[in-house]
Regions:
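Active-site-adjacent structural elements that line small-molecule/cofactor binding pockets in enzymes
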Residues: 1-187
Length: 187
């Protein structure tokens, strides 16, 4: 609905927990969003950290990094011209299959996370990184420097976007706004 009533709003989840999704279904669904929005989609992914979520989906938490990497590779293959040309480790699908629809443009993949390994993973495999609201300005600067260093040292070319997640809540007073959002913020 938002895609239909706007012309320049970038659309997509800030962070979806990649290990909990079927990567081929995610590729199809997100390509559809990109088509509907006229190429304004960005897909944010992360590994997740809440053990109860992994338990609920029956996904071993210790596979989360590998599952994220596998998802990114599957998405890139699914959105390329021709067949998938990638054999996913965690989903039973032939690399010869052609996934449709294709997105309207090259969908940027943004990875989230505050830990140094997460940031370095984003620098290597993604088009963007989302700094969580828990990082200070100094913490964001340190992570951005790390991204630059990784991309320079490993000769990675291309644009790389940095997003900074900030929360905003409205109320008649600061206290009322905090009261209304506190439980959801700490969930």
């Amino acid at each position: 609905a938002l895609a239909a009533v706007t012309d320049d709003v970038e659309l997509g989840p800030c962070i979806a927990l990649a290990p909990l999704y079927d990567s081929v279904r995610l590729a199809e669904d997100f390509a559809t969003i990109d088509q509907i929005s006229g190429g304004r989609a960005t897909l944010g992914l992360a590994i997740g950290s809440n053990v109860s979520e992994f338990d609920a989906f029956g996904v071993p938490e210790d596979e989360r990094v590998e599952r994220l990497t596998d998802t990114v590779e599957t998405l890139r293959g699914a959105w390329s011209d021709g067949p998938l040309d990638y054999d996913p480790d965690f989903h039973d699908i032939s690399p010869d299959v052609t996934i449709t629809p294709k997105p309207a443009h090259d969908v940027p993949i943004m990875l989230g996370g505050a830990a140094r390994p997460a940031v370095r993973r984003a620098a290597r495999t993604a088009d963007a990184w989302c700094a969580p609201s828990s990082l200070s300005v100094g913490g964001v600067k340190k992570r951005v420097d790390d991204i630059r260093n990784v991309r320079d040292e490993e000769d990675i070319e291309g644009d790389f976007q940095v997003y900074v997640l900030q929360h905003g809540f409205v109320g008649d007073s600061r206290e009322e706004a905090w009261e209304q959002m506190r439980d959801g913020y700490f969930f």
